[in-house]
Structures are given as structure tokens and as C-alpha cells.
């Protein structure tokens, strides 16, 4: 049988999702826990192979097993064996032709960026940071040039193993709440470091180093060396994976960090002002 899981994790303590020799990965931790429950070796496949330091709010994985266990064992049992920074949220049996990676039609990533002179304390490792002020309107204008199907060679890493750089970016929304910026990227698939490389360029534009039209130049040149440096992984989250309705997977409502950020920020500001009266 084939089982599908949805999990969330804090990526700070790992070399990334994928197993690597002599390094700790999210995949290796999950496979170890599931193998103990099944009393046999389990290998998992993920929808997205997140990099070191990148988090997931809704990672989808599948695995095959001949062992019969209640679905609760794959959730509660796994969570009892996993470290605190990885949590299985949901499990279900799925048809044998389902594939967590290749059946996915769309992936969504969120990036949370703090823009202020002082580095983050409470949100250290959970949000990116720049000490520069950013122009939201300029970044939004630049983002519109990226929507659609393009050759994203200027925004792929040198280590990217994809056969070509053609990707379709469906949505790139940028919003601001106080000192926090939220970037939402949605595409059929992403190249290695694509989100963080685009983010680096948008931040340069927000700082005023380049005009929004610079994005068009980068797309046309297809040269990674002309673009901005790869930005920090700290604020990047795999937030959702979409599948065709025939797989009968649920629409999973994740806890969006900006809601938590806004709640904490609102409480902090109200307490500070109350103390000054």
C-alpha cells in the first residue's frame, strides 16, 4: 500500500530535506521514525526538496509499505519518535499511482522578511532580515515582470540539475505589515535556489539599487552572474502543494506565520504604549 503524509518542520537544524552522507536531514529523521513503526525499512519521497535552513508548513511525502498499521500510528507514533522540530500533521492511504513529487501541479513558497535597523531576536532563523528600508511599490512592479512562463536561468544556482530553466510562475504577491514583508511565490515547479535568487533581486530593487525594469534585463540575459546574490534561507517556507482533485487529498489550512507575527507585534506595541502613559 501507499501512504501519504503531510508534515511541518523547522529547517534550521538540518542540511535540508534530502539525505546526505554523514549529515542530518529531515528525510533521514522521518525515515528512521517510520521504519521503527513499520519494523522494516521505509523510504519516503517528498513534493519539495527544501534546502538547509528552509522550513515547511505543508510538506507532502509518500512511502510504500506492506505493513498494516492504523493511520494514527503514522501520525502520533511518528511524532513520538521524531525530534520536536518535525511534526507529522496528517496521514492517509492513497492510490498506488500517486507520486508526491510528480503528481504535484503547483507549489507555493512564502518568504518572511523583516526590514529594520536591528536584527531579529524573537524571529531569529524564522524570518529573513535586511537593515535597509524597502519600497513596496517598486518591488511589486518588478514582480509583475516575472509572472508567466520564462527562462529563469538568471535565477538558478550553478548546482541546479534541472534539464532546462523554463518555469511558469503563476503568482508572486508582495505585501507589507509594519516592518514585515511577505512574498508569496506560486509555480508549477521551482529551480534550485530560484526563490531566494529572485528575492535577492527584488530586495536590490526595493533598496533603490536598480529600477524595476532590471528584472526584464536579467530574464533576457539569462546570466546568473549579473543578478543579485542568493538571499538567506531563514524566512523561506514551503507552504503548500496542489494536486489534481482525483487524488482526493484535503485542502490543508496551514498556520501562516504572518498571522502569528501580526498578533505578537500588535501585543508588543500595545503593551509598550500602555507603559508610557
Swiss-Prot record:
Substrate binds at residue 109. The keyword Aminoacyl-tRNA synthetase does not apply. InterPro entries: PsdUridine_synth_cat_dom_sf, PsdUridine_synth_TruA, PsdUridine_synth_TruA_a/b_dom, PsdUridine_synth_TruA_C, TruA/RsuA/RluB/E/F_N. The keyword Isomerase applies. Pfam families: PseudoU_synth_1. One of its GO terms (biological process) is tRNA pseudouridine synthesis. Keywords: Isomerase, tRNA processing. It catalyses: uridine(38/39/40) in tRNA = pseudouridine(38/39/40) in tRNA. The active site is at residue 51. GO terms for molecular function: RNA binding; tRNA pseudouridine(38-40) synthase activity. Its EC number is 5.4.99.12. PANTHER family: PSEUDOURIDYLATE SYNTHASE (PTHR11142), TRNA PSEUDOURIDINE SYNTHASE-LIKE 1 (PTHR11142:SF0). Belongs to the tRNA pseudouridine synthase TruA family. Homodimer. Formation of pseudouridine at positions 38, 39 and 40 in the anticodon stem and loop of transfer RNAs. This is tRNA pseudouridine synthase A. The lineage of its organism: Bacteria, Pseudomonadati, Pseudomonadota, Betaproteobacteria, Nitrosomonadales.
Amino acid at each position: 500500500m501507499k501512504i501519504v503524509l503531510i508534515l511541518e518542520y523547522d529547517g534550521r537544524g538540518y542540511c535540508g530535506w534530502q539525505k546526505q552522507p554523514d549529515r542530518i536531514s529531515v528525510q533521514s529523521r522521518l525515515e528512521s521514525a517510520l521504519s521503527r513503526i513499520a519494523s522494516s525499512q521505509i523510504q519516503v519521497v517528498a513534493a519539495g526538496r527544501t534546502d538547509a535552513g528552509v522550513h515547511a508548513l505543508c510538506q507532502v511525502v509518500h512511502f510504500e509499505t506492506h505493513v498494516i498499521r492504523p493511520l494514527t500510528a503514522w501520525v502520533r507514533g511518528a511524532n513520538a519518535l521524531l525530534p520536536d522540530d518535525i511534526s507529522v500533521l496528517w496521514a492517509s492511504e492513497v492510490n498506488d499511482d500517486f507520486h508526491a513529487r510528480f503528481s504535484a501541479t503547483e507549489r507555493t513558497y512564502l518568504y518572511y522578511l523583516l526590514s529594520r535597523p536591528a536584527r531579529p531576536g524573537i524571529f531569529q532563523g524564522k524570518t529573513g532580515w535586511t537593515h535597509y528600508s524597502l519600497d513596496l511599490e517598486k518591488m511589486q512592479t518588478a514582480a509583475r515582470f516575472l509572472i508567466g512562463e520564462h527562462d529563469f536561468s538568471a535565477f538558478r544556482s550553478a548546482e541546479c540539475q534541472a534539464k532546462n530553466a523554463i518555469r511558469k510562475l503563476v503568482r508572486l504577491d508582495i505585501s507589507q505589515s509594519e516592518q514585515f514583508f511577505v512574498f508569496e511565490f506560486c509555480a508549477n515547479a521551482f529551480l534550485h535556489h530560484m526563490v531566494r535568487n529572485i528575492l535577492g533581486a527584488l530586495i536590490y530593487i526595493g533598496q533603490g539599487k536598480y529600477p524595476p525594469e532590471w528584472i526584464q534585463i536579467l530574464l533576457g540575459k539569462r546570466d546568473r552572474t549579473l543578478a543579485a546574490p542568493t538571499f538567506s534561507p531563514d524566512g523561506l517556507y514551503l507552504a503548500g502543494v496542489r494536486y489534481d482533485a482525483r487524488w482526493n487529498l484535503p485542502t490543508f489550512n496551514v498556520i501562516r506565520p504572518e498571522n502569528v507575527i501580526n498578533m505578537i507585534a500588535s501585543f508588543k506595541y500595545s503593551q509598550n504604549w500602555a507603559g508610557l502613559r
